[in-house]
Amino acid sequence: MNNVIPLQNSPERVSLLPIAPGVDFATALSLRRMATSTGATPAYLLAPEVSALLFYMPDQRHHMLFATLWNTGMRIGEARIVTPESFDLDGVRPFVRVLSEKVRARRGRPPKDEVRLVPLTDISYVRQMESWMITTRPRRREPLWAVTDETMRNWLKQAVRRAEADGVHFSISVTPHTFRHSYIMHMLYHRQPRKVIQALAGHRDPRSMEVYTRVFALDMAATLAVPFTGDGRDAAEILRTLPPLK
């Protein structure tokens, strides 16, 4: 496990890690520090951090769970009831059907407006999911990850410990729900419309997106380079030529 770039302790190499077009890792990391310093913005991982964390999940079941959270923005409860039947991987545009736990608990077919379709835009993930299902051959209507929240957290803690033992450290505390926040931020970094992300993430209230977009307000303010410091001597010379106010 010596081929992974340490994410926090190699500043000379972090610019090599891709985030999104026109965005480097060092800048994105700095923005995250600012945005999360008050606690108003949820903690999230950047794409290279997620890639590294998944690298330290050798168990394919663990790996595919967190890869699914990362690729879809699912809530933990939603992922717990996902079945092979939820996925459509063969079409030109693969996707997954996402139901809330409350909807799944009801009998009968759920209303169409309570089924969320999330496109799977990363072909590598789609191929991994196909390969995993072929290998494990799960029943089509059997949940893929019917485990407790505590079990999911333990799987994640094991990966974090493996990473730290290999010299890879994360500057935020990572939980399963962190992957949902990370998905939303990753989509924003790739300039997807807020309303589209809101729909894909299953947020009913548009205001729920504001906690994420404030990161980009910080970025915009930083790039404006608005000067506030002037030459006091020159200013005094100019003001001296003006008539006094009556």
UniProtKB/Swiss-Prot annotation:
Keyword Transferase in the entry? The reply is no
- Domain Tyr recombinase, by residue range, is 40-225
CDD domains xref list: DNA_BRE_C
Question: Keywords in UniProt for this one?
Answer: DNA integration, DNA recombination, Plasmid, Repressor, Transcription, Transcription regulation
Q: Which catalytic residues are annotated?
A: 75, 102, 177, 180, 203, 212 (o-(3'-phospho-dna)-tyrosine intermediate)
Cite the InterPro entries for this sequence.
DNA_brk_join_enz, Integrase-like_cat_sf, Integrase_catalytic, Resolvase_Rsv, Tyrosine_recombinase_XerCD
Provide the GO biological process annotations: DNA integration; DNA recombination
Keyword Nuclease appears in the UniProt entry: no
The domain of life for this entry's organism is Bacteria
Entries under SUPFAM superfamilies matching the protein: DNA breaking-rejoining enzymes
As one GO molecular function, the record gives: DNA binding
> One Pfam family of this protein, by short name?
Phage_integrase
Family to which the UniProt record says this protein belongs:
Belongs to the 'phage' integrase family.
This chain's protein is named: Probable site-specific recombinase in afa region
Q: Which organism is it from?
A: Escherichia coli
What high-level taxonomic lineage is stated for the organism?
Answer: Bacteria, Pseudomonadati, Pseudomonadota, Gammaproteobacteria, Enterobacterales
